[in-house]
Amino acid sequence: MAASAAADVSVYESHDDHSITEGDVVIVADSDAAYDTVLDYAKWSAIFPDIKQVTVTKKQGDDARVTFLHVDGNKENVHFHNTPAARMIWFEDTGGRAEVWAEMVFVPGEKSGTTRVHTRVYASVHGVTGLFVSDDKVKTLRTQRVRSELHDLQAYFAKH
């Protein structure tokens, strides 16, 4: 199943901005239910295996501040600003050395009971760090992240 699931994940560079990588996957879930599931930040450690712990530090309306502790010990502070009417989850990393934001949109699939998840990840390194990290390296990391997260979403919803 892993091989066919991986084949269903499409990852490509944005036509609009060389700092954005996009991707698509179809998951087995109603789009509203899938969006609501991913909005539950506590479930991110079950959806994304590289996340060990989730701490919601603030939640107000469609905005939230969340800290993810990854299995490698890396801590990520994230600001969410979601758009429920568009079934869009948008978030930015607030503590890194790079400017990083991502969005996931949950669109009803062609077949009943499916959802197409479209994601965009922007990452750009500025300042002194930019002298040591090439654009190609950042592009590779973006591509790996988009592919991995879409695969994780697909695997999670295949089981639930």
Task: For each feature predicted by the language model, list its residue ranges.
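Hydrophobic ligand-binding cavity/cleft-lining segments
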Residues: A3-K59
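Acidic surface patches and DE-rich sequence motifs
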Residues: S14, H70, G109
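A generic structural signal for beta-strand entry/edge sites
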Residues: H18-I20, G61-D63, A86-M88, S112-R116
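Glycine-rich portal/gate segments that line the openings of hydrophobic small-molecule binding cavities
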Residues: V26, A46, T55-W101, S124, ...
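Extracytoplasmic/secreted proteins, especially bacterial periplasmic and envelope-associated proteins
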Residues: A33, K43-A46, L141, R145-S148, ...
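Hydrophobic pocket/interface hotspot
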Residues: A33-V38, W44, F80, V117-T119, ...
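Beta-strand/loop substructures that line and gate deep hydrophobic ligand-binding cavities in soluble
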Residues: T94-S148
